[in-house]
Amino acid sequence: MAVLLSGQYSLPVSREVVYAALNDPDVLRECIPGCEELEVRSDGIFAAVVRLELGPLKTRFRGKVRLEDLDPPNSYRISGEGDGGIAGFAKGGAALKLVPDDEGGTLLSYEAEANINGKIAQLGQRLITSTSKKIADRFFESLTNRLQPNPRTAESQ
């Protein structure tokens, strides 16, 4: 089953800051919902263990993601795959673009496609798409919160 997702988020900081955060394993580990482990291997691949709940299915996915077509701080592509054991397998990619907005922040947009099989695919396209969108929204909400300028820092200067 193929799942298509796209989204757009406004972040309160420059493209350079957003791009750096999206390549920082500590930031990603903190912002990815259900992330239990995340490391950057010597070959540049991000390896992760993420606990997911998709409807009645709860599973741990072990996955690998590679960043490709790097154009800092404008864009890159993500390709990867994840194995959820008996729950199923997913493989896909996403294109991510960062554009400055009129207020000094960044407009982030993405388009993603994943191919899913196994028990997860039996849950149905609508449930998988809505759950995936919620996970993406939670990730970008966490990222936005992490990147918010700290008002106390500005006051203390």
Regions found by a protein language model. Give the residues of each.
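Intrinsic-disorder/low-complexity, polar/charged segments enriched in Ser/Thr/Lys/Arg/Asp/Glu/Gln
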Residues: 2-8, 45-47, 60-62, 75, ...
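Hydrophobic/aromatic beta-strand elements that line small-molecule binding cavities or substrate pockets
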Residues: 7-9, 35-36, 63-69, 92-100
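Glycine-rich portal/gate segments that line the openings of hydrophobic small-molecule binding cavities
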Residues: 39-82, 138
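Beta-strand/loop substructures that line and gate deep hydrophobic ligand-binding cavities in soluble
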Residues: 82-131
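A conserved amphipathic terminal alpha-helix motif
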Residues: 119-156
